[in-house]
Amino acid sequence: MVEIHPTAIVSNKAKLGTNVKVGPFSIIEDEVEIGDNTVIHSSVKIRNYTKIGSNCEIFEGCVIGNIPQHLGFKGEISYVEIGNNTVLREYCTVHRGTSFDDGITRIGNNTYLMAYVHIAHDCKVGDNTILANCVTLAGHVKIGNYVFVGGLTPIHQFCRIGDYAMVGGASAVDKDIPPFTRASKNHVLLYGLNLVGLKRRGFSSETIKLLKEAYRILFRTSPTLAEGIKEVEEKLPKTKEIQMLLDFVKTTKRGIAPEASKRKLLISDEE
């Protein structure tokens, strides 16, 4: 049974699943789908072309499916898709995609967005990911699975953050953050592997050892990234994790965030 508060405005064209609850003063427009057992708290606005999965919880003041903040947007149909078991805390905003990408802004399953997170047009956020308070994604940002981003962190348009990475709070991300790594500071630097996260996710000691060696070669000792890639391919076994790391760095368009120790050496040389 669907429960809709008398003060809520819900279009009779919207598709609401079993046991959906809609709180006071919330507005749900025509072209909206909401899965079973999802809870929409008070004063939420869900606009056209939005699809929300099952067992989600959307807290007070969220606005989902608003048009993108993109000067090239001409009113074309585009979408927001949110997976199952995902939580958006107070005052999150999620904008629709644009024709400059695939037209979809997507948030995965089992993902947790804390208060005041902003997800801009065409972003992709993976499964089991946590974005802390006031994380701000510019357009076309891609964040993988099992990622944690600390609060008050802005992420530049088109940047990527790979699976199992961790970004410290109040960082400024203007380069790609490879999978399995730990990054922080303004502007963002790499600080080794996300060892705590990898152990929590059950990665073996052998896998972590290989990733440490790949990290050392790619980001600390090789004169260039291209030389580091070649050395890793020649010296290390082609495990799934090593291949994931190589695929990520090979396809960077924004560039990879600098390694902290290299950055310190560069500053010393300049001084």
UniProtKB/Swiss-Prot annotation:
Its EC number is 2.3.1.129. It catalyses: a (3R)-hydroxyacyl-[ACP] + UDP-N-acetyl-alpha-D-glucosamine = a UDP-3-O-[(3R)-3-hydroxyacyl]-N-acetyl-alpha-D-glucosamine + holo-[ACP]. The keyword Iron does not apply. Gene3D superfamilies: Hexapeptide repeat proteins, Udp N-acetylglucosamine O-acyltransferase, C-terminal domain. It is an enzyme of class 2 (transferase). One of its GO terms (molecular function) is acyl-[acyl-carrier-protein]-UDP-N-acetylglucosamine O-acyltransferase activity. It comes from the Bacteria. Belongs to the transferase hexapeptide repeat family. LpxA subfamily. Homotrimer. Involved in the biosynthesis of lipid A, a phosphorylated glycolipid that anchors the lipopolysaccharide to the outer membrane of the cell. This is Acyl-[acyl-carrier-protein]--UDP-N-acetylglucosamine O-acyltransferase.
